[in-house]
Amino acid sequence: MRMNIVQKILSATCFALLPLLAHAGAVDQLHDFLKNTRTLKAEFSQAVISRNGRKPQQSSGTIAISRPGKLRWEIVKPFPQLVVGDGEKIWIHDPELQQVTVRKAGQAIGSSPAALLSGNNDLEKNFTLKDAGEAEGMAWVDATPKAGDSGFEKVRLGFSGGDLRAMELFDSFGQTTQIRFSKIERNPALPAATFKFTPPAGADVVGE
């Protein structure tokens, strides 16, 4: 289950938030964020809510992005997990299971939520974007994947005061993943090692 959650969001990667003009719509803010952000690091908290209303699964950690294509999504609590994208491959490491899953980046990201943040600026190629009104003090944009096999019905991104503060993922099984970002740094210098991964000795490597 924990591995499935990480694979769904992949990176769901994340970002540093860009101050924008207050009158800009949420879609415009998303485009401006992508245009002006090359690297980002932040902390996140995440809750996965099932369709049957069971207690949400909570987790927290850190993210780093270097656009295009590189990301690092590290869950620290309650169970360590790591997703690293080096631009060519996506590595998913579960220390408790001693397992590493590796996939080609293009196949893994495609129309996934990770593509919204770590990909190039050509969002309309993979997503239909629209302003989705205001709620919880944020202006929202809905991103609906054009591919029918993305595994997601839509992704929502929330802006507050011109900053991108939230991300919500609605999957095909009725689960909702809510992500909130804090301590965001936009365009920091990130060491190259941030986006490199070598499977630890003894780990079971599955995939490409």
From Swiss-Prot:
Record flagged with keyword Membrane: no
Record lineage: Bacteria, Pseudomonadati, Pseudomonadota, Betaproteobacteria, Rhodocyclales
NCBIfam families registered for this protein in UniProt: lolA
Location(s), subcellular: Periplasm
Name of this chain's protein: Outer-membrane lipoprotein carrier protein
Subunit-structure text: Monomer.
Keywords: Chaperone, Periplasm, Protein transport, Signal, Transport
Disulphide bonds in the chain: none
Signal sequence coordinates: 1-24
Family: Belongs to the LolA family.
The keyword Transport appears for this protein: yes
GO biological process: lipoprotein localization to outer membrane; lipoprotein transport
Entry's Gene Ontology cellular component terms: periplasmic space
Functional note: Participates in the translocation of lipoproteins from the inner membrane to the outer membrane. Only forms a complex with a lipoprotein if the residue after the N-terminal Cys is not an aspartate (The Asp acts as a targeting signal to indicate that the lipoprotein should stay in the inner membrane).
